[in-house]
UniProtKB/Swiss-Prot annotation:
Family: Belongs to the purine/pyrimidine phosphoribosyltransferase family.
Catalysis: reaction(s): AMP + diphosphate = 5-phospho-alpha-D-ribose 1-diphosphate + adenine
One BP annotation, GO: purine ribonucleoside salvage
EC number(s) reported in the record: 2.4.2.7
Lineage: Bacteria, Pseudomonadati, Verrucomicrobiota, Methylacidiphilae, Methylacidiphilales
The organism of origin for this protein: Methylacidiphilum infernorum (isolate V4)
Top-level EC class: transferase
Protein name per UniProt: Adenine phosphoribosyltransferase
Record keyword Translocase present: no
Protein biosynthesis found in the keyword field: no
Length: 179
């Protein structure tokens, strides 16, 4: 069984293409759309996430704008929990907390509704790719600001050379694929 899973993960990894100089020169963008565009690979991603998190006491899933939303809905449905959108500034209609940070693309602001998390709720954050870790770290800090207990940050892929995992310390993180 381990060999079959390992083989499937290698095929999944091959489905993620690298786009040079997107969205700006010098960035090697990991495009997940070929992987999520095929049912067998999208199902594999969700199956791996579900297996990892189904026995953990997660109350809600926080999804990072925008590709974190791709996994959050299906995963939340499978786990029977709600979703919290963590969005760019100006996208959430109610009272928000906001934090400024530097991304690989420039200055950014992430927001979360102030009432999205009850004190002590166990939160899983999901996103597509862990690159520098700055966006994910900001999302984790927003969860904490709301009073949530961050269980883990889960990613489809991690760009190990950018050392995002180091920037996330001490927050626990998991990635299905490493590049």
């Amino acid at each position: 069984m381990t060999f079959v899973l390992s083989s499937s993960i290698e095929r999944l990894k091959e489905k993620i293409r690298t786009i040079p100089d997107f969205p700006r020169p010098g960035v090697m963008f990991k495009d997940i759309t070929p992987a999520i565009g095929e049912g067998q690979f999208f199902r594999l991603i969700l199956t791996i996430f579900i297996a990892r998190y189904q026995k953990k006491k997660i109350d809600k899933i926080a999804a990072i704008d925008a590709r974190g939303f791709i996994f959050a809905g299906a995963l939340a449905h499978a786990l029977g929990v709600g979703i919290i959108p963590i969005r760019k500034k100006g996208k959430l209609p109610y009272k928000t907390y906001e934090l400024h940070y530097k991304s690989e693309y420039g200055e950014e602001v992430l927001t979360i509704h102030q009432d999205a998390i009850s004190k002590g709720e166990n939160i899983l954050i999901v996103d597509d790719v862990l690159a520098t870790g700055n966006t994910a770290r900001t999302a984790a800090l927003l969860v904490e600001k709301c009073g949530g207990n961050l269980m883990e940050l889960g990613f489809l892929a991690e760009l190990s050379n950018l050392k995002g995992r180091e920037r996330l310390f001490p927050f626990p993180c998991y990635s299905i694929l490493q590049f």
